[in-house]
A protein has these predicted regions:
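Exposed, low-structure sequence patches enriched in small/polar residues
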Residues: 1-172
Length: 172
């Protein structure tokens, strides 16, 4: 942690740049072989960035932090069910919001620094339902449907629907 201050997070002049991830998973609740998972990720502005570019949390310009980058959050819900041996049914929902990256001046010289969610860029949502059946060891038949929607702040939203049918070979 190259930059840290002993100022409480609640002080408006502090530049506390944090990210956190909370999650829970419960199995066999109400129905045998059912696993429910919920996860929340929140990355405040300017996390993973430093005044000195050599100290940024990146490798070859790829962030080493969360894939959303700074000033973003997402919530995910997953239900995984195995009604029979070798049969798996999975439902998934994700909602994500992304804000702007900001500038070095905003990060270091603006007091207080911009709050989470400043300069909103877009929202995305994804819902999917997949089922797979294991024919042989590491050979699965897969069928799935997903709906993905991107809503930029200055344009109309774009929605894509996708149906997947396939034969999956896995060496592990």
């Amino acid at each position: 942690m190259p930059e840290s201050r002993l100022i409480p997070i609640s002080v408006p002049k502090s530049r506390n740049q944090i990210a956190y991830q909370l999650g829970a998973s419960v199995t066999d609740i109400g129905l045998p072989y059912l696993t429910l998972t919920a996860e929340l990720n929140k990355v405040y502005p300017f996390v993973y960035r430093n005044f000195l570019p050599a100290q940024n949390y990146s490798n070859s310009n790829f962030s080493l932090g969360d894939w959303m980058g700074a000033n973003a959050d997402r919530i995910e819900f997953i239900a995984n069910y195995h009604p029979r041996a070798r049969l798996n049914v999975r439902a998934y929902y994700r909602l994500m919001k992304k804000g702007g990256l900001g500038t070095v001046e905003q990060q270091y010289y603006l007091t207080p620094t911009p709050v989470y969610g400043f300069d909103p860029q877009y929202k995305t949502s994804k819902i999917s339902l997949e089922t797979s059946y294991e024919l042989y060891s590491n050979v699965n038949i897969l069928f799935g449907y997903s709906r993905y929607q991107v809503t930029p702040n200055i344009q109309k939203s774009v929605t894509s629907n996708q149906v997947n049918i396939g034969l999956v070979f896995s060496p592990y």
